[in-house]
A protein has these predicted regions:
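N-terminal small-residue-enriched
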Residues: 1-455
Length: 455
């Protein structure tokens, strides 16, 4: 039976609960891996299932299932389970107007429009470039895509049907000359492989040439430097060091954190604004409506240097007496929704990258990120770095890690550029409470930090 019809057969009025909802997800995923020219994996993974929740007297009961022909009886079983629990303080679920959201954007251009052979052909088109370079060892190409349809209905009359789509690949390689090595990668993101091969090859060729000078580049002298961070580093910094601390569930029961993160507190320069916004179609953080049926809002976490908001599910908003922001997300139908980011970024400023670099007499330009982590303090492993002298780039240097304290770094941001970019990925994602990988995106412009620890 069609999934929308399955939802219409559910009778929430027969349940003696305060609130109930159901989310059905149908997902198709493809993963392809080539290692040193050999095909190691080529799999397609379809799934269909539902996640059901009921709330009564402050207690939740929930279940995931792939049996979609007995949803009413599943709800009745959940009602029986939750009724056995001792009542807690009643959670005042906010009242919403009945509303249906239909947001189908990708049916005509989804990754499913390409065959498995076409996806393998895209990967194989990259292999000659990797294999013809004598300095490259152990090259790998990883392709992954996902097309997902979601249906939702709640006992307070909210429903939706929307789709999500992304595709992309990593070309990963190690350059080795004597005992010197340098690891690099090229990341691709698109909606469908059709017509992508030619530009992907050109991008890979340029990336290999750009990486070669780093094989024998000198290692940076550890210390504190004035730095320009590019848009990819900006995104990692924003997500890892600030975005997670803006997720409101971290504040529940933590009075010290509530005090530290009071709305209106000055935390950075006036030219700094940080946003979480799911309304960016064709990004990996695309989210028109969350897994509780709340529209995703553009949420300012920092506006003009001051704490302006935080990310909420319905429950965290109720408990902190704030407003839901549409950030309740689950990785798939097997998980409950929790507070997660979407597209998290720093808004652009006015100066070009060239103008930012020209302002630095002695410093570093940090480009790209291999990985990063952090809460109150952060560490990021950059992909590349260049020495800046007298306002000009002066050659590559090897940098292992940049690090700092979040609030100190926010206050040390001097200038924000206008070269805005959001970085999406079809591989990896964000991990939280065993829900990994959840698709997100992050970015912003380049910006100057007055002082940062570099090693």
């Amino acid at each position: 039976m069609e999934n929308s019809k399955l939802l219409k057969e559910i009778d929430f009025t027969s349940l003696n609960v305060d609130y109930a909802d159901i989310r059905i997800e149908k997902t198709d995923e493809t993963k392809i891996v080539y290692q040193s020219g050999d095909l190691r994996e080529a799999t397609t993974s379809p799934s269909l299932g539902a996640f059901l929740r009921v709330l009564k007297d402050g207690n939740w009961a929930f279940k995931s299932t792939t049996e979609l022909n007995s949803l009413q009886s599943e709800f009745e079983a959940l009602e029986g389970r939750v009724s056995l629990l001792p009542a807690k303080s009643k959670l005042s679920w906010p009242k919403r107007d009945s509303q249906h959201y239909e947001v189908m954007r990708y049916q005509d251009k989804s990754c499913n429009k390409a065959s498995l052979k076409e996806k393998k052909d895209f990967c194989e088109a990259l292999l000659p470039t990797l294999e013809s370079e004598e300095l490259i060892q152990g090259p790998m190409v990883i392709y992954k895509d996902q097309y997902k349809e979601k249906w939702f209905m709640s006992s307070d009359g909210v429903s939706y049907h929307y789709d999500y789509n992304h595709a992309g690949a990593y070309a990963i390689f190690t350059l080795k000359d004597g005992d010197q090595i340098y690891e690099d990668s090229v990341k691709y993101f698109f909606q469908n492989v059709h017509g992508q091969s030619k530009s992907a090859i050109t991008e890979l060729e340029k990336a290999i040439e750009k990486a070669k000078p780093f094989i024998h580049a000198p290692t940076v002298e550890p210390g504190k430097y004035k730095v320009v961070l590019d848009s990819e580093i900006t995104g990692i910094f924003t997500h890892e060091s600030f975005g997670h601390k803006s997720e409101a569930d971290f504040m529940l029961g933590d009075e010290a954190m509530k005090e530290e993160w009071q709305i209106g507190k000055s935390v950075g320069s006036e030219n700094l604004s940080i946003v979480d916004d799911g309304n960016w179609p064709e990004t990996s953080g695309d989210l028109p409506v969350d897994d509780e049926g709340n529209l995703k809002t553009k949420t300012y976490l920092i506006k003009n240097g001051k704490l302006a908001g935080r990310l909420h599910s319905t429950q965290t908003a109720v408990l902190l007496d704030e407003v839901p922001t549409g950030n309740a997300r689950a990785m798939n139908f097997q998980y409950e929704p929790i507070v997660r980011m979407t597209n998290t970024y720093i808004e652009k400023g006015e100066k070009s990258l060239e103008e930012l670099i020209s302002q630095i007499d002695d410093g570093l330009y940090i480009v790209g990120a291999k990985h990063g982590m952090g809460m109150s303090t952060f560490t990021i492993a950059p992909s590349k770095a260049y020495k800046i002298l007298n306002g000009k780039l002066c050659g590559p240097v090897k940098v292992s890690v940049i690090s700092g304290n979040v609030f100190e770094t926010l206050n040390l941001i001097e200038e924000v550029g206008n070269d805005f970019h959001i970085a999406s990925s079809s591989l990896g994602g964000c991990g939280k409470m065993e829900q990994f990988p959840l698709p997100v995106a992050d970015g912003g412009p380049s910006f100057i930090v007055k002082e940062m620890t570099v090693s």
